[in-house]
C-alpha cells in the first residue's frame, strides 16, 4: 500500500510474456493508497493537519501518461510531506493531481464501504461517493471477518457485527448507488495472496 516499486517487475514480466510466449497483456499501473478528508484541516497558510484524522484505502489507476506522472507525484507527496505512520494523501492534493487518473473506492477499508458499514446518512454517503470515478464490491468471503465475534475478548471488539445478509445488502447498496450516480461498479477480489499456503505471509 502506498508504493509503486513493483512497476519495473510488472513491465519486465509483461515484456517476457510477449517475447517468450506470445502473450500480449496490458498493464494498468496503479496503487492502493491511504486517503483522508482534509476538509477543515487547512490553515490560513495552506498547511494541512495530516495527523489528526484516520485514513481509508483508495485505488489510484493511471489512465494516461499524465496520470502516471501525477501518480508518481502523489506517491512522493505522501512519503515526503504527509507521512505519519503510513504514507497519507489528503483529498485536496489528490484532486489537484487527479488528471489522467481513475480513482476507485477500494475495499471494505475504503471510505465508501465504511460509510455504509457505519450507516451514515444518505446525503453524506452521496457526498463521499462523488469523489470516486468507480465503486468496488468484493465477494462475501472477503469481508466475512465482519461477521466474526465482536464481543469483549473477541478478535474485533471495536466493530459492529454483521451477518451475511448485511454484507449482501452493502454490496447491493453500492451497486444501486453506482447505477443512480452513473458510476461503474467493479467486482474485485481484493486478493492479497495467490494460494492457501501463501496466506501465512500476509
Q: Which ranges hold each PLM region?
A:
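Phosphodiester-processing cores and adjacent nucleic acid-binding clamps
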Residues: 1-202
Amino acid at each position: 500500500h502506498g508504493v509503486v516499486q513493483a512497476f519495473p517487475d510488472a513491465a519486465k514480466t509483461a515484456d517476457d510474456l510477449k517475447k517468450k510466449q506470445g502473450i500480449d497483456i496490458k498493464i494498468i499501473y496503479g496503487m492502493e493508497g491511504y486517503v483522508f478528508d482534509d476538509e477543515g484541516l487547512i490553515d490560513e497558510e495552506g498547511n494541512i493537519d495530516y495527523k489528526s484524522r484516520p485514513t481509508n484505502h483508495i485505488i489510484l489507476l493511471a489512465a494516461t501518461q499524465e496520470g502516471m506522472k501525477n501518480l508518481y507525484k502523489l506517491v512522493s507527496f505522501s512519503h515526503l510531506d504527509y507521512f505519519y505512520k503510513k504514507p497519507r494523501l489528503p483529498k485536496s492534493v489528490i484532486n489537484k493531481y487527479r488528471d489522467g487518473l481513475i480513482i476507485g473506492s477500494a475495499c471494505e477499508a475504503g471510505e465508501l464501504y465504511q460509510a455504509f458499514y457505519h450507516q451514515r446518512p444518505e446525503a453524506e454517503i452521496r457526498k463521499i461517493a462523488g469523489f470516486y470515478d468507480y465503486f468496488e464490491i468484493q465477494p462475501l468471503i472477503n469481508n466475512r471477518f465482519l461477521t466474526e465475534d465482536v464481543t469483549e475478548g473477541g478478535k474485533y471488539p471495536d466493530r459492529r457485527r454483521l451477518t451475511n445478509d448485511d454484507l449482501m445488502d452493502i454490496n447491493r447498496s453500492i451497486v444501486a448507488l453506482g447505477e443512480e450516480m452513473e458510476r461503474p461498479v467493479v467486482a474485485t477480489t481484493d486478493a492479497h495472496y495467490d494460494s492457501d499456503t501463501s496466506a501465512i505471509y500476509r
